Amino acid sequence: MKKWIVSVILLVVSLGTLAATNAMQLVNDAKKQINVTIGYDPAYRKMAFPMGDVPLHTGVCTDVVIRAYRHQQIDLQKLVNQDMKKAWSSYPKLWGLKSTDTNIDHRRVPNLETFFQRHAKSLSLTDITSFKAGDIVTWRLPRNLPHIGIISDKKTPAGIPLVIHNIGAGTQEEDILFKYKMIGHYRY
């Protein structure tokens, strides 16, 4: 019995360490896009499926998240498409589509918000201690424009986590966590 309890404790500790390692790897993979993804281009593009991408030198905020997860063999293009097919009624109908579109669905913040609400842990929007490196955060910018980013391992001198995102000038690591209206905070 004691051996079993020790084994369970070791497993829980190992899984916690693995999650932290994956979170830091996600941050590092997002940072790899800084000074590489230098533009912002929201144009609709045909792309491969699965694992399709726009050219690495450009993209939008969602592409930062998608690319970082791909380095961990997590294909949000495929996962969002599968989940939308399974739970079409759960996803927003903001674009007038009647079915899924593998070229764009995963590149839309409201779709990623829905996916993370369904499959990730939702966390506090106000408790500063709840924001950990690798967490995903979504906002609404002025004119209700959706935005998404990844919490960095770096913080401001005041202790506020920086965010890795692309808001128009390529992938950046910046102090924007509380600059806009926060909508979602997820750990996946």
Regions found by a protein language model. Name each.
Residues 42-62, 75-99:
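Acidic helix-start/capping segments at beta-turn-to-alpha-helix junctions
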Residues 22-27, 85-164:
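...with weaker cross-activation on analogous glycine-rich loops/strands in unrelated enzymes
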Residues 159-188:
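Low-complexity, Gly/Ser/Thr/Pro-rich intrinsically disordered linker/tail segments
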Residues 20-25, 52-63, 106, 125-128, ...:
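Soluble non-cytosolic domains of exported or imported proteins
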Residues 23-27, 31, 62, 66, ...:
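Extracytoplasmic/secreted envelope proteins and their assembly/folding machinery
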Residues 31, 35, 66-74, 81, ...:
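Sec-exported extracytoplasmic/periplasmic mature domains
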Residues 4-13:
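Sec-dependent N-terminal signal peptides
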Residues 14-18:
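N-terminal signal peptide c-region/cleavage motif recognized by signal peptidases
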